[in-house]
């Protein structure tokens, strides 16, 4: 498939890119190459291929979400430079 100059300018505008003429020509060639490759992939017979979500078996490796004991609030605030109403007091970051 031939990628014309208007398509390159449209895509560049969507991506908010300013391209020189040389960059537009290179991008056109690159996109043509990519589209050609995808066209070849579309020609493959995948009727006997089982659809998968992942090519490798993946399982959830997160731990169970369970309630656990934590430090008492007074112990955590013991070394705080500043505290207020049982909470850490930190400098204002956003106006």
From Swiss-Prot:
Superkingdom of this protein's organism: Bacteria
Quaternary assembly: Heterotrimer of A, B and C subunits.
Catalytic reactions of this protein: L-glutamyl-tRNA(Gln) + L-glutamine + ATP + H2O = L-glutaminyl-tRNA(Gln) + L-glutamate + ADP + phosphate + H(+); L-aspartyl-tRNA(Asn) + L-glutamine + ATP + H2O = L-asparaginyl-tRNA(Asn) + L-glutamate + ADP + phosphate + 2 H(+)
GO molecular function, one term: asparaginyl-tRNA synthase (glutamine-hydrolyzing) activity
Biological role stated in the UniProt entry: Allows the formation of correctly charged Asn-tRNA(Asn) or Gln-tRNA(Gln) through the transamidation of misacylated Asp-tRNA(Asn) or Glu-tRNA(Gln) in organisms which lack either or both of asparaginyl-tRNA or glutaminyl-tRNA synthetases. The reaction takes place in the presence of glutamine and ATP through an activated phospho-Asp-tRNA(Asn) or phospho-Glu-tRNA(Gln).
Annotated Pfam families: GatC
Organism listed in the record: Acetivibrio thermocellus (strain ATCC 27405 / DSM 1237 / JCM 9322 / NBRC 103400 / NCIMB 10682 / NRRL B-4536 / VPI 7372)
Similarity annotation: Belongs to the GatC family.
UniProt cross-references to HAMAP family, sorted A to Z: GatC
Key words of the record: ATP-binding, Ligase, Nucleotide-binding, Protein biosynthesis
Protein name in the entry: Aspartyl/glutamyl-tRNA(Asn/Gln) amidotransferase subunit C
Example of a GO biological process term: regulation of translational fidelity
EC supergroup of this enzyme: ligase
EC number of the protein: 6.3.5.-
InterPro entries associated with the record: Asp/Glu-ADT_sf_sub_c, GatC
Alphabetized Gene3D superfamilies for the sequence: Glu-tRNAGln amidotransferase C subunit, N-terminal domain
Upper taxonomic lineage: Bacteria, Bacillati, Bacillota, Clostridia, Eubacteriales
């Amino acid at each position: 498939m031939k990628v014309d100059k208007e398509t390159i300018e449209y895509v560049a505008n969507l991506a908010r890119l300013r391209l020189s003429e040389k960059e537009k020509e290179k991008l056109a060639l690159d996109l043509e190459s990519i589209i050609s490759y995808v066209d070849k992939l579309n020609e493959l017979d995948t009727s006997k291929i089982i659809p998968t979500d992942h090519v490798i078996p993946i399982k959830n490796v997160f731990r169970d979400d369970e309630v656990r004991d934590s430090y008492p609030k007074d112990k955590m605030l013991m070394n705080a430079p500043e505290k207020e109403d049982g909470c850490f007091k930190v400098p204002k970051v956003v106006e």
